[in-house]
């Protein structure tokens, strides 16, 4: 898929919280470069999705329940998709759990589910984690995105699970997957050789992939009403 010539990047998140631009019109930016930040809790920094030139910071009409214009950054792509230099970590095990959480925060990683949970906030809840669940069970019928990801990127998913386990200091880590996702299961089993992460196959029955239902399926524990999984020593991340 070709990169669009122009990208309109809204600065408003969650309805009203606006990020502060870190760039100005005329600036050249690289892919993954931070272009806006917010001091509000629960709002991650924004990064350039490709390389190019900032052409404007002004109001644009965007899809919104309020049906009104919003302040946005207009990025004109240069077509090169050039990235910033990454300071790669040779071995994540050389870092403390706080350093790992900080790197996740700098990477502006957050969940793509409806809640959009910020990953580093989940990791820094201050509550002891006994079990980390990597949720590879599809939450709705006919969804296959997780299965495709695991077929193609099983090694990276397992590595990510190891990093998350180190970051939250979980005693145990499992990957939960629908039992009928045979290709994804095979890819994980080949990757998991000599790996302490457990693979748990669950019945492909809606809504097993939902957070609280999956926790109950795996642990026989129920998350109390008004509480979070962290309150019973469990942390869950989707693939």
Where do the protein language model's features map onto the residues?
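Hydrophobic alpha-helical positions that pack around
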Residues: 171-239
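Histidine-anchored nucleotide/phosphate-binding helix
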Residues: 151-167
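Short, well-structured beta-strand-loop connectors
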Residues: 24-37, 55-56
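N-terminal, Lys/Arg-enriched amphipathic/low-complexity engagement segments
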Residues: 1-22, 74
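Acidic low-complexity segments
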Residues: 56, 61-118, 122-124, 182-183
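Short, charged beta-turn/beta-strand-edge "cap" motif at the junction between a beta-strand
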Residues: 34-43, 61, 79
């Amino acid at each position: 898929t070709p990169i669009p010539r122009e990208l309109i990047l809204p600065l408003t998140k969650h309805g009203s919280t606006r990020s502060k631009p870190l760039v100005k019109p005329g600036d050249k930016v690289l892919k993954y470069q931070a272009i806006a930040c917010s001091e509000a809790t629960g709002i991650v920094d924004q990064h350039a999705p490709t390389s190019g030139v900032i052409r404007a910071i002004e109001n644009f009409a965007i899809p919104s329940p309020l049906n009104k214009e919003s302040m946005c950054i207009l990025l004109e792509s240069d077509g090169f998709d050039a990235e910033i230099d990454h300071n790669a970590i040779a071995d994540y095990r050389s870092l403390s759990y706080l350093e790992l959480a900080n790197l996740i925060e700098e990477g502006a990683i957050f969940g793509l589910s409806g809640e959009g949970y910020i990953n580093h906030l989940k990791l820094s809840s201050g509550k002891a984690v006994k079990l980390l669940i990597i949720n590879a069970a599809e939450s709705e019928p006919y969804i296959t995105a997780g299965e495709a990801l695991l077929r193609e990127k099983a090694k990276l998913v397992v590595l990510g699970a190891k990093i998350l386990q180190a970051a939250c200091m979980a005693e145990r880590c499992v990957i939960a997957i629908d039992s009928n996702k045979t290709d994804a299961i095979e890819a994980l089993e080949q990757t998991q050789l000599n790996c302490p992460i457990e693979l748990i196959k669950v019945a492909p029955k809606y809504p097993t992939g939902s957070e609280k239902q999956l926790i109950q399926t795996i642990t026989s524990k129920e998350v109390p009403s008004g509480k979070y999984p962290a309150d019973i020593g469990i942390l869950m991340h989707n693939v």
